[in-house]
Every structure is written in C-alpha cells, then in structure tokens.
C-alpha cells in the first residue's frame, strides 16, 4: 500500500487526527486499494479555479461513495471526497478532535443553504462539511495541505443545486 492509501485506510477506520493531508504528487494508482474509482467515464468539473476530471467509485470495504478529482491529464490526484463518512462522527466530535477550523465557508446540501458548513483545516488537507443543526457530517474532502488563502482557488467545490 502507498502512503496515500494507508492514510485513507486509517481515516476510514475512524482516526481523523491521523490525517495530515494527501501527499503532493499522488497519482490515481496510489489510492489503491483504499479507494476503488475506475478511470472510465469521468466527468469534468470545476475544482477551485481549475478544471478537473472526477472519477466516481467507493471507499474500499464500505458502501461509501468516493469521488477522485484528478488533473485533466489524469496524472495527479487533487482531491478525494467521501460522502456521508461515519468515521467523522458528529460535528461536535470533529471539533473535539481537531479544534476550530481555520475557515468556515458557506455551502449547501442539495438546495438547502448551510451557512458556515464547510470547515476547512488547510494545514491538514481536510475539509469537513457539517450540518450542526442535524448533528451530521455529510462529506469530507481530502487534499494536499495548503495555506488558508490557497484553499478556495485550488480545492473549493460549491455543492448547492438550484431549484427549477
């Protein structure tokens, strides 16, 4: 297993404090076997100010959906997002383990705006999407550690949907 795969496996097993960021230069095969995200039929999407290919898969050993965001030439993993991560626990558990985030950004869950729901720990390469009112963490994003001012241009994804 690679260091990226090992780190994701430790995170999956419930240790948020063990996550210190996606290693710079991580390639898609480096995520195996912790993440199974086949390279076929990726979608293109905005990641910060960049365009990325998104591969959809699962966190190995679970039914948790995983997204692997890679550079357009698929050479480097920029971000791994995991939906409904039970290993994160409730929002208050995250705060107990990691303390207050460096950034609290507004995001949305579907069509519901959630002010301050994107908790960014840029020095850890971690963003936690929390609905404090419902006591639920609904997404985590894993990336290479950065300065707080770099997060929005490199890794930010606005998740809200518009009503028709």
Kindly label every feature range from the protein language model.
Residues 1-117, 121-123, 131-164:
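Short helix/turn-capping signatures at newly exposed starts of structured segments
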Residues 128:
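Terminal recognition/anchoring or ligand-binding modules at protein termini
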